[in-house]
Structure formats: structure tokens, C-alpha cells
A protein has these predicted regions:
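N-terminal (or domain-start) structured segment
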Residues: 21-116, 156-160, 170-213, 302-321, ...
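A structural signal for short loop-to-beta-strand junctions that line the ligand-binding cleft
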Residues: 89-92, 108-127, 151-153, 221-222, ...
């Protein structure tokens, strides 16, 4: 019996080694499709990871980043769906914008995002802040809640900016009014000029642009979205550890914990807006052995001394999510429940938008 078990174990690991050995990208070129222009956040994410992935994939393949911007990321995303081969020679650079197109039912979407095979996710986080004259102290919304008019930027209700409308509604900012067509960068400039009352940024721009204003006393933190763990717990953002998370602020304002349909909506929004902010995906139907090889390369990459040294500055302080957990997050982000859609549509209607989540 012992001899049989020994033979079984040896045979099993030999078979595993054979399967891994069969995945070899020597002499091959991998095309990483990024549905945005060169120089944007998803582009920088791909180009930072590119040399490390080449280093740790078997055969050290050449990886070329292909930018296909247009249509709010739909042009490049549809191209990937229609042209990518499930043999490990195509990668997709996904972002919140790509996910929102699916989750909100954009009829132009042809890509089957929820069936793609995630290799890794790069979480990000949203910081909200206001001018110091509009808050009694940091993390205080009382003055903004009392105002009849609280202006903020909104690029389009069909983008991730939709989530701002939901957040402000849940916090009782009755005077909150979006200015459609104003991008995040344009909105921040308008904020600095005193033309709008509340603004937000992701991690990189928060550190680069907002923190200096906070240190000069011109701007104060309000809150962050929060870091959502695999168990559903929400922790504070290490870049602003004193700032409450959205669930904390919700409880402070409403006198009760975030729960039920509101909590479900928050988890879906958090998955799309934070946990899966940037990601590297393989096409649907990619064989498990190829997916495993990419994930193993990603695990080796994050332990590379050079990667560790440079990643915090290039990617932010949040650890990459690798493997099966990443797949569950992408599905949660891309498929909104009917109750979540109802909540989003209700706040859209309240703000007089004709656009509706499908």
C-alpha cells in the first residue's frame, strides 16, 4: 500500500510538471490590449508590469502593449473579444470604465467580461475632500449637509462617476448637484478655483496633488471609499488613515450601520471602483494550465526585489490580488443585482438624468 501511495504521489507531481512544461512562450509575442490611449493609468499599469511578466513567464516572451482607445473603452474591449486567442498570447488591460460599461448594460458592449480569466487585480481607492472653509474640521460633513447647493464634477452618468451620485445621496447631501461634462482633472481645477464644493481623486493624484493642499490648510479630507477585504470587512485607506471609510461616514450620518440592499450596492460599487480598478485578464476559455502559469508568474513577480522596490511608487500601496479571488471580484463588479440597479436608477432620476442602468 505504501509503495502504491508513493508511486501515486510521484506520478501526480510528474504529471503536474509535464503540464507546466508544455506551456512555453519561447519565441512568441504576447499582445496586451489596453482600450485607452497611451500614458493613461491602465497604460502605465501595463507598462510597469510588462518587463517583470516577461521575466517570469516560461520562455520569456516579448510582450507588446497595444493601445486601442475610443468609445469610452468599448472599441478596444470589443476588439479584444473578437480577436484574442485563448492560447496565452493575448492579455487584456481592464479598468473600472470597462467594467461599468458592462455592469450598466451599455448596448454597444460585445465583450463577455464576467467570463474572462483574471490573472491579477490592482485595487485603488477614492478620496473625497472639500475646502477648509466648508468644513468645521476634517471628516465633517455638517456644513455641506446644511448647504442648499453642493456642486461636484461628473464626466457622464454612464461612467464610474455615477457612483458619486449614489454616495452623496446615501449621506444626505440634499444640495448635491453634479456638473455633467466636467472630468476629474477639470473638476479638481474648478474645485481649486472655488467653483465647486466637493471633489475627489484616486490614490496617485491624491498623494501628488491633494496632500500638499491639505498640508497648506486649504483643503480637508472628508472620507475614502475604504478597502474591502475578501471577508467583506472594510478597512481604512493607508494613505489617509485618519479619514473614515464610506461605511463609517454612513453610520455617523444616519445613526445605523450600512446593511441590506445598501450594503449589497456598496460591495458591487466597491468591486468595480476599487478592488478591480486595474486588472490583467486572459480571454474566456483559456485553459487552466495557461491561467495557472500566468498566475504563478505574477506571484513570482510580486516577490521580486526590484518589483518590491518600485511598485509602491508606480502602483500605489495596495497589494495585488492574484488567483481565484480575483475572478470572484470581477464577476461581482460586472454583474449588478436588480436591487443595485434600482438604487442607481433612483438616484439618477432624482438628479433628472434620463440615462438609466439597464
Amino acid at each position: 500500500m505504501r509503495k502504491f501511495l508513493t508511486l501515486f504521489v510521484v506520478s501526480f507531481f510528474s504529471l503536474t510538471s509535464i503540464v507546466s512544461a508544455e506551456v512555453d512562450f519561447a519565441g512568441k509575442t504576447i499582445t496586451w490590449v489596453v482600450p485607452f490611449k497611451e500614458g493613461g493609468g491602465t497604460s502605465r499599469f501595463a507598462r510597469f508590469i510588462q518587463p517583470f511578466l516577461t521575466k517570469y513567464l516560461p520562455g520569456n516572451p516579448d510582450i507588446q502593449v497595444m493601445h486601442i482607445p475610443g468609445g469610452g473603452a468599448i472599441k478596444g474591449s470589443n476588439y479584444f473579444q473578437e480577436n484574442a486567442k485563448a492560447d496565452g498570447t493575448f492579455l487584456f488591460g481592464c479598468s473600472t470604465s470597462v467594467i461599468v460599461n458592462v455592469a450598466t448594460g451599455n448596448p454597444l458592449v460585445k465583450y463577455n467580461l464576467s467570463e474572462y480569466r483574471p490573472v491579477l487585480l490592482l485595487p485603488q481607492n477614492t478620496h473625497w475632500f472639500t475646502r477648509s472653509d466648508l468644513a468645521t474640521e476634517p471628516h465633517d460633513l455638517s456644513k455641506l449637509i446644511e448647504r442648499d447647493l453642493v456642486l461636484y464634477a461628473l464626466k457622464t452618468p454612464a461612467s464610474a462617476d455615477l457612483f458619486h451620485i449614489w454616495v452623496f445621496d446615501k449621506l444626505g447631501l440634499k444640495g448635491a448637484k453634479p456638473i455633467p461634462g466636467l472630468s476629474s482633472s477639470g473638476g479638481y481645477q474648478a474645485f481649486l478655483r472655488g467653483e465647486i464644493h466637493i471633489s475627489s481623486h484616486g490614490a496617485a493624484n491624491y498623494v501628488k496633488k491633494v496632500k500638499p493642499e491639505i498640508e497648506q490648510g486649504k483643503v480637508v479630507d472628508l472620507m475614502t471609499l475604504g478597502i474591502i477585504g475578501a471577508d467583506g470587512s472594510v478597512s481604512r485607506n493607508p494613505l489617509a488613515p485618519d479619514a473614515p471609510t464610506f461605511p463609517e461616514m454612513y453610520e455617523k450620518i444616519n445613526g445605523k450601520k450600512l446593511e441590506g440592499d445598501d450594503l449589497e450596492a456598496f460591495y458591487s460599487i466597491g468591486a468595480a471602483w476599487s478592488q478591480a480598478s486595474k486588472s490583467m485578464l486572459l480571454p474566456e476559455n483559456t485553459p487552466d494550465e495557461i491561467v495557472d502559469v500566468f498566475r504563478e508568474a505574477a506571484r513570482k513577480m510580486v516577490n521580486d526585489p526590484e518589483f518590491k522596490e518600485k511598485a509602491s511608487k508606480a502602483l500605489g500601496p495596495f497589494p495585488l490580488i492574484i488567483g481565484e479571488e480575483a475572478g470572484e471580484i470581477v464577476k461581482k463588479a460586472a454583474i449588478f443585482s436588480e436591487t443595485t440597479k434600482d438604487q442607481l436608477n433612483a438616484v439618477l432620476k432624482k438628479n433628472r438624468f434620463t440615462y438609466q442602468v439597464q
